[in-house]
Amino acid sequence: DTAQTANWRTDPAVAAGGYFEDLASHGLDLMLHLLGDITLAQGIRTNQQGLYAAADAVTGTWQFASGATGSGYWNFGAAQALDAVTIHGSQGEIHFSVFGEQPVVLRNAQGTQSHEIAHAENIQFFHIENMQKHMDGLVTHPSTSHTAQRTTWVMEQISRPPF
């Protein structure tokens, strides 16, 4: 964000972690859902652009309980917006976007498969509807206070000062 306009996401009094606090939780929550608990996380955050008070660049590294490692980089002042996740495995890789309507691409020894997953027009509606069904005991929703706490812990570890 290089607009230099007042924005709750860039005001540390409202959102201490800036855009990272608002947006990174979604991708990190998805990583926890797909790959399991993260047991170690650390990071670096800084304000490179000086356009607002919150950090605009964050780098994080983490380790899953399985031993797999991961890393992420969020730069909210970059010239080009990029929303991409790549999971590299011993037999191939999967590539997808957290927010964008990009195809999910699987590459392995058998070739490349690409799948379009259209976003619902009102994605929050289905999330809220399924949370209500969860609270009524009708279904088990994958997003709970426990998963939110895990994601928050990872973000706090990435965001905290190194010393």
Each language-model region and where it sits:
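Predominantly a Rossmann-like dinucleotide-binding segment in NAD(P)-dependent oxidoreductases
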Residues: 1-44, 48-51
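A generic structural signal for residues located within well-ordered alpha-helices
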Residues: 23-26, 123-126, 146, 150
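Acidic/polar loop patches that form or flank catalytic/metal-binding clefts of enzymes
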Residues: 37-43, 69-71, 94-95, 141
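Anionic-ligand binding region
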Residues: 43, 57-58
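NAD(P)-dinucleotide binding in Rossmann-like oxidoreductases
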Residues: 48-55, 65-129
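C-terminal helix-rich "cap/oligomerization" subdomain common to oxidoreductases
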Residues: 65, 131-163
